[in-house]
């Protein structure tokens, strides 16, 4: 069985449709032991700065090895590749659009990788 993993969501999806629930369902199919916490699904639509401020204020309060999924992207569906960013303590998955810019400013140790298919 996969290891238990704490995963946070910071999105502009809102809570009036199926998108957040669908994402959680996919994660639980892959790892039924995952724990998912919503930091905020009410980031202003397509507002990268609002998303950046939200995750920057919250992530530091979570345990080491938490995976933070930050999905605020006015270019969704474009050719923009997602990023996998690791710091000394945290892991981030987000679009390459600046939504993690404040995390970059606060963390000294960063590894940034584009995720590609294959």
Where are these regions (language model features)?
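Short HxH-centered metal-ligating active-site micro-motif
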Residues: 58
């Amino acid at each position: 069985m996969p290891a238990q993993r704490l995963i946070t969501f910071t999105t502009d999806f809102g809570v009036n449709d199926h998108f957040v629930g669908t994402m959680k369902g996919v994660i639980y199919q892959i790892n039924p032991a995952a724990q998912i916490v919503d930091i905020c699904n009410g980031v202003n639509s397509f507002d990268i700065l609002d998303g950046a401020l939200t995750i920057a204020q919250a992530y530091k309060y979570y345990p080491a090895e938490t995976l933070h999924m930050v999905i605020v992207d006015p270019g969704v569906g474009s050719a923009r590749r997602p990023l996998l960013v690791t710091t000394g303590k945290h892991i981030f998955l987000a679009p390459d659009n600046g939504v993690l810019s404040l995390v970059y400013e606060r963390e000294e140790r960063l590894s940034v990788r584009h995720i590609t298919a294959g």
